[in-house]
Amino acid sequence: MLEGRILAVSTQTKAVAGIPGAPKRVSFAKIREPLEVPGLLDLQTESFAWLIGSPEWRERAAARGDVGLVGGLEEVLEELSPIEDFSGSMSLSFSDPRFEEVKASIDECKEKDMTYAAPLFVTAEFINNNTGEIKSQTVFMGDFPMMTDKGTFIINGTERVVVSQLVRSPGVYFDHSIDKGTEKDLHSVRVIPSRGAWLEFDVDKRDTVGVRIDRKRRQPVTVLLKALGWTTEEIAERFGFSEIMMSTLEKDNTAGQDEALLDIYRKLRPGEPPTKESAQTLLENLFFKEKRYDLARVGRYKINKKLGIHVGEPVTGSVLTKEDIVTTIEYLVRLHAGDKTMTAPGGVEVPVEVDDIDHFGNRRLRTVGELIQNQIRVGLSRMERVVRERMTTQDVEAITPQTLINIRPVVAAIKEFFGTSQLSQFMDQNNPLSGLTHKRRLSALGPGGLSRERAGLEVRDVHPSHYGRMCPIETPEGPNIGLIGSLSVYARVNPFGFIETPYRKVVDGRVTDEVVYLTADEEDRHVRAQANSPVGPDGRFLEDRVLCRRGNEEMEYVAATEVDFMDVSPRQMVSVATAMIPFLEHDDANRALMGANMQRQAVPLIRSEAPIVGTGMELRAAVDAGDVVVNEKAGVVEEVSADYVTVMADDGTRKSYRMRKFNRSNQGTCSNQRPIVDEGQRVEAGQVLADGPCTENGEMALGKNLLVAIMPWEGHNYEDAIILSQRLVEQDVLTSIHIEEHEIDARDTKLGAEEITRDIPNVSDEVLADLDERGIVRIGAEVRDGDILVGKVTPKGETELTPEERLLRAIFGEKAREVRDTSLKVPHGESGKVIGIRVFSREDDDDLPPGVNELVRVYVAQKRKIQDGDKLAGRHGNKGVIGKILPTEDMPFLPDGTPVDIILNTHGVPRRMNIGQILETHLGWIGKAGWKVEGNPEWAKDLPEEMWEAPADSNIATPVFDGAREEELTGLLGSTLPNRDGERMVDDNGKAVLFDGRSGEPFPYPVAVGYMYILKLHHLVDDKIHARSTGPYSMITQQPLGGKAQFGGQRFGEMECWAMQAYGAAYTLQELLTIKSDDVVGRVKVYEAIVKGENIPEPGIPESFKVLLKELQSLCLNVEVLSSDGAAIELREGEDEDLERAAANLGINLSRNEAATVDDLAN
């Protein structure tokens, strides 16, 4: 069937039959998966390959047998061509887009703030239709941003990701509603194009069929039919079966086509004089001209499918036809009449039913390629206007394609998209998983999509058609819930933009290994069994009745012979992050959602450690995320150093792989690569050569395996607080490196050029000790807040220099100039070690913004040990803040003296229903201790042979929905290997007797003990803690600024004032509202009194009161301030002089550019 072939086109590009050299993980999986997980970045890379029409994409398309598929750029140029002038005597057409080599490497672009782009050229052909002369030229169309291998773009030196957008597909949508007054069934239909006017038909409560063109006033539908050239007799013949159509025809007063056209014109263009020709042109332009109306291929496909027209023919034509309109009206009339099926014009029987707009058969993805293509289309249509104007103004003889074309609009449109579009986002590089998830994200927001405020509950809710396409778990908490999702593991996008998911074909009750990809609406026509349905060795179902999903309805038991398809994998319905949660099936969905989201917030630690309890997804996720170095050709490792790995391939070629060393990610985390192969080692193609951040031996490793006890401890772990052992601090178990980038530029000012120098006024040599002769801090220097990183001076002066003065300065040098210190200092609250410096200068021909002569970047790395107030989390949504760090000797310990690392409260489990964390703890202990199954117990009958025995420190995989069962856990806990003393610490129930580290007494009850995987999250207390004594004030209100970034104060708000009033603390309140806030004169006087040891003076009038007065006066209200005896008080401006005098005496700087530190403010 043609339709099925067209839909199932995209293939798995990276067929990874298993990654060579991968670490061993013992798996509890019982179900064999016939299909490998597809390339996880294909969503991005395939779409971009289609856009640029790369040779690899063409090869894959040819191999699939796709006919007439053109690349995205070609498609747009074909649409645009030819551009004709207003008389039609000249035309310009474009073809053959091609790219030259990219201008600079990815690393160079990142370093120099450039865009990773390739020059785009097209062939432009100018034809003079009068003389038949043809001029052809290759035209440069601007630099086109290229996608990196990792599915990202580098724009102005920063890595960005274009998120795929979920939108309603063009097509016809039938809807049902009930009239509130009469309680009658009403039906309506909308024909929604990709671009152009909407066409709506409806049946109202008076049983007449109406039409709305382009959302204007309603008219009888027969007016439109007559305007399209149908006579009353033809309408009666076609719709004679329908009473409501006949009654509509009777009520329609228009006589013939001309009258109908004029009637429509009056509704669409009220106030304009109607003529038959203009009305005819208007109607044709609205729906039947490709320039104005475009259903797109997908819209045409959806209409053909819904209405049953042109079935089995190729999808062609992107405008409406008269047949479409008539068939749509017939479908609506039959729907209203309650018919269940209808015979389409081609003789095909189609079901008559209303549409569900939230169904994934009606929602499609606009992937990267299409989003950029739409933007280019906008740019080209702007260019088209320019070309037309130039055709009419320029001399015909002198015209060449180059003189007609202005590429500025195209370049600007592309730049605008990558720089400012809601869908072009700053890449989340917190860890490899967060980057991978970001590239697989699906957003319903953005231009042409929904807005947060308008989106209702139905759009956000989980829909049955999401199964295997969009993850029901992973979505943000908060206003975007349900509007942003994540692509499921096995899902892929077909050329129409619909998401497909794979199924195994079932023939006569026998499951085959043939895999078919189905879209959501195709899937609804079949019966689908679950992946865990019991199947015998011959592929036949073991049970007569199988639990299946039929259509969009509930589950039901069906005879084995009726089953059409079966899921390929139990993890088919979830996304990558969700598939990395072990025992997901035992967690409540709300907590699983938090677990999936919090894995993306884990910071890379100094030493990564893969989880003891994984799900088998870790390896593929890490390799596809692209932060590990993967070998390209099989061969032997020739040389290994910290910076390079060189591989001599079997075909005699050499390849050196460069490691990234301590680079800063977009989120300020540290990205570092470390080789994991040795010299002389044999490596295969696809093998991991070096670990990146958060990976160990090529597996995703976001946190640490810690020995956990689940018990309350003196109330210190109340309300999700966590107690940690001092060992984790001392041994840097949870220590991470954070790198901050500080930037300063030297510009030309009106008073002269700024200068980067070591010669800074009023600064001691002590402060300059770490600066080199240029005035830039040396690499390796330890710096803390307030230290100078780059010395810079700016000319100071009230007036511009006269030409004479400038001449004298030029002759005698600039010694006499007044300069002020504008050095780059370490911001408040930060410290660390300088690890890198980049200097860009106009003298070295670096590309700098206008007016900038020199730019210096300083990278400061900070090692952050774990501390009270940091946030930790497990993978099951079990998060908490560190409440106390205990000395190791005070921690509870096991009978063999091993102290636990972390104590979690028992109260965090029952109400939240994330039991997965308990099972993970038990299985973690089993993996750490190792096991050996004795005899032939009943619980072990489903375990594979290799699972009956495992050494200590074994890593385990328990895939989602197909993992270790409860009885297997209990059995294995009883089969764990004893420790060196021959004792088993933990009982069959997973509990151990713990001893109190302080007293040595055992705790009264056994405690659940085991190994849990704990992540350190990005919410670190160092980034949040903040204090201020003196600092900047707002210019208008003269009150302190707010927030850590502005070095602001704490707002003493309305409710806090009430509290003071309640206590009757009048003087304290007055002080808070005046001299501690915005009584400008009072502030200085109080400071003076404190310095001189005098009594605190009376407060004055707060600045905000003066602002209020001025605002009221600006509304033309004559407001005066009266004293207690009724005399008007003049609020003098002269107070400023007293203020300046007092400030000068005390040496206080009252200018806007406050010094960066408290010490400087006080000096």
Curated annotation (Swiss-Prot):
Its job: DNA-dependent RNA polymerase catalyzes the transcription of DNA into RNA using the four ribonucleoside triphosphates as substrates.
Organism listed in the record: Nocardia farcinica (strain IFM 10152)
Coiled-coil region(s): none
GO cellular component: DNA-directed RNA polymerase complex
Taxonomy of the source species: Bacteria, Bacillati, Actinomycetota, Actinomycetes, Mycobacteriales
Entry EC number(s): 2.7.7.6
Oligomer status and interactors: The RNAP catalytic core consists of 2 alpha, 1 beta, 1 beta' and 1 omega subunit. When a sigma factor is associated with the core the holoenzyme is formed, which can initiate transcription.
Name of the protein described by the UniProt record: DNA-directed RNA polymerase subunit beta 2
Top EC category: transferase
